[in-house]
Amino acid sequence: MMKRWVISLLFAYPMWANAQSVEEYRQAMDAFDYEMPIERIVPEKGDSMFTPLRAKALKAMNRHSEALKEWDSLLQSDSTDAKVLAELGECYRSMNRNDQAVICYRKALKLQPENKFFRQQHLRSLLATGNYEASRDAAHAWLEQDSLSAAGYKFLGEAYQGLALEAPEMLLYAFTAYNAAYRRDSLDGHTVAQLAALFNDNKQWSEAVDVTEIYRRSDKMNIDVNRQNAKAYCMMKNYAKGVDRYEALKALGDKSFTTLYYLGISYYGMEWYHAAERNLLEAQKLRPSAPADVNLLYYLAKACSHTSSQQEGVAFMKEAINLTEPTDSVMVHLYDGLVDCYSRWHKGDPYEKIEVMKKAYSLNKKYTLFFKIAELYNKQKDYANAIHYYEKYMSMVPKDKQMALDETGKPMVGWTSLYQIAERKIKEIREESFFQHGIK
């Protein structure tokens, strides 16, 4: 009897010891001591008790290639283990080998068709490969099984967004899918952010505000949702709210190009030019090697023209012009901006300003530029050219704008129009010339 008891104890001891070791390894991993199981567990093919622990520890230490070998050794023992297939898929995803991850999750999904995690990871991996048609089909297959799945509609929206890169009309289907996902789960941050982005892209800014504000009642920390919320306020020209939201994003650690750019635009809209200049300069530094952003340069130049950086403002606007394709509408916009920058830069070369204004007139046909040109010539005491451009300006002013008139069309007492100023300047120049040279 004693002999049998001793033999039973001897057989039971290894099992007890293994259980103790497993618990010890798990405790070490719970304490983030991944090196301990990696060092102590000797890789042995088919050791199903310890191999998963070592594989998970290797993955946690970003030693994915070694972890792959461990999971693969287990798969050789049992190719129908869905859990091992999923772990193998996760390793492949971590290594950005998404094609292999798709294969692993597809096999796991065949073994457990109702497993939502396997289905989600299969779709995520498919989307990461850029195979949007297959992703769309997989999402539709999911929704055939579960038409109420918010996640299924969300992935369908992502698939259609990918297809829209080649066929823009697919964006409508993306919107429909995200809208369906939102109706089923209005608190999914990714869905809300994507739906709001589509609203913003379609200039439906109030709708973007609505969906993001509802989400923010339960979570104010989601970066993607807050970005779309802030952008919507900025595009609606609610610049104060835009500044508030973008500053909150910066406080959360978001100092991306987009956040700094739109924060600068919002400050510019509030006429806080120093803050606009500061944030737009920060945004520009984030793109040193990329092609310059013309819109960024335009607003940066305009902001600088209102601070002590007028010279830099002129340079930024010139850079924007040099980078722009010569389409009339864009060039008019930029040359108007350059004229404004030069007008505020009092130390700038007056003849450079004159050439810029002449170029601007050739694009926008704003005859008031002739008055500004005349003023510059007058300051340089180039009276012949000054008179020429004053007269050129006066010849183009409509009769109803030659005098300062009120709403009823009557002359305004104490007000002088630019036309009258030009008329007076010509008279003063000629009188001065007469007294100095005897020439009228």
Question: What do the PLM-derived regions correspond to, one by one?
Answer:
Residues F50, V84, F118, G152, ...:
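TPR alpha-solenoid repeat register
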Residues D30, A60, S94-M95, A128-T129, ...:
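Register position in tetratricopeptide repeats
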Residues L53, E87, F117-R124, F155, ...:
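Canonical tetratricopeptide repeat
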